[in-house]
């Protein structure tokens, strides 16, 4: 019975939509980008996505620093983000990617520009995408698992 439950969980995870955020690095006093990459499943097309981006205080980011990626642009989507300070995470950006009825293809749906202050200490910090929700072509909510990215300050 336990084996069936574990296998079922793996099957559900294998069939779900995912976002990926490859690791990135930045030197103190400079900027870099983080790509948010969408990995779709053809059996459940997505037309819109919303998420929260939790950025630690060691990095600097503004809502205007989050722009559409090439996959989102090819589907004629627009991206709107709102940022606020968060005592737990540092900065919190809430983003909605939507517009029209075209399905999101695989690829970068958002590009996040971030910077490390000149006095940033070397180390690794974690950026989190959480509370991710997709919207299907039938306008049904499609939960997407949270994801983290490691940012190395050199």
Residue locations for each model-derived region?
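Sec-dependent signal peptide recognition
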Residues: 1-8
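Hydrophobic h-region of N-terminal signal peptides that target proteins for export
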Residues: 8-16
